[in-house]
Amino acid sequence: GWWPNKLVALLNVIQQIGWAAVGCITGGIALSAVASHHLSPRVGVVIIAAISFCFSLLGLRVILVYERYAWIVFFVIFMILFGEAAPYVDNKTPTSLEGSALPGAVLTLLAIVYGSSASWCTIASDYYVEYPANENRIKVFLLTTLGLAVPTSIGMTAGAVAASTLNNQPAWKDAYDEGIGDALLNIFRPSGFSHFLVVMLMLSAVNVNIMNTYSAGLSIQQMAKPLSAVPRFIWTFLCFAITIGLGVGGSSDLNQYLQSFLSLLGYWCTSYFIIILEEHAFIRRGKFTNYNLDAWNDPNKLPHGIAAAVAFGLGVVAWVMGMSEDWYVGPLADLF
């Protein structure tokens, strides 16, 4: 509907800016480590944000070309990480968590992984609009599924492998206490090569942020017609400024920022996806010919969206009942 979609656009802006801040924090911490901490992580956050902002101004086609090939570099780096860390993996030391703390930690990780992947559903159309209208749907589905599952699995597995080595490598653990960048510098060898790899890995933050800032600008324009009349680069600059503020504020505690933000994404993204899926399956009967594409920006031809708004509201009730965050624990979650 016309009006509920404004809320979705606002939530998407918050989500994309939050993701951009995550990228800036991780990239800034890594950049500080490469500079032997002569550079503040906060300055690193600003540098990453500025590079991302400049790239996002180049337009969608340039972004797509960059994204098409950038993954190769990061894939190679992750494979090197596996090779360097694998000899020191510790899969024998029992966990120190007891009782409900262990399943709670597992569920938190699953929520973070799910939330990071599910957030793609709210921006996919920003990029899939470039596909021909007659593109094979199975091909798009498979590419999307693999494009989410494979990188997420590699990243999560690499993190688990690297974390498990800390029991066997006290020096790496001490470095990790200083920051993720210091840990990577110790894992990668030799020293000069490790600096190069961490700098390249830092660019993965730029890789993510380019899409975040671009999509955030689009979502701002969708919130109201007067906003769509403002050039997109102005909204992109505004997102850039907010990202710097969040990144600088969250750079002191990356893990807490990640858990507090990323675990929230799965809540509203799931509600959004389910509503869209139900409309397509039951109201549109699974046929794209039942959509009036010419009415996408005409409130007189679009439904009011009351049913979708109510469904979304019921979803919010479910979130509040079951969520367990540092700042709030719902009544259902409090039972466990």
Please describe what each predicted stretch is.
Residues 58-71, 119-154, 167-182, 213-233, ...:
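Hydrophobic, small-residue-rich membrane helices and short re-entrant helix-turn-helix hairpins
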Residues 7, 26-36, 49-70, 85-88, ...:
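Membrane-water interface regions at transmembrane-helix termini and the short interhelical loops
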Residues 82-88, 98-164, 189-213, 301-319:
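Hydrophobic, membrane-embedded alpha-helices of multi-pass small-molecule transporters
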Residues 43, 47-48, 52-85, 98-100, ...:
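Membrane-interface loop-to-helix entry segments
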Residues 272-336:
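C-terminal membrane-solvent junction of multi-pass transporters and transport-like membrane proteins
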Residues 42-47, 222-256, 297-319:
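Loop-to-transmembrane helix boundary motifs in multi-pass membrane proteins
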Residues 33-44, 61-70, 185, 189, ...:
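Transmembrane helix-loop boundary segments of multi-pass membrane transporters
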Residues 9, 35-58, 72-83, 116-124, ...:
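Transmembrane alpha-helical segments of multi-pass small-molecule transport proteins
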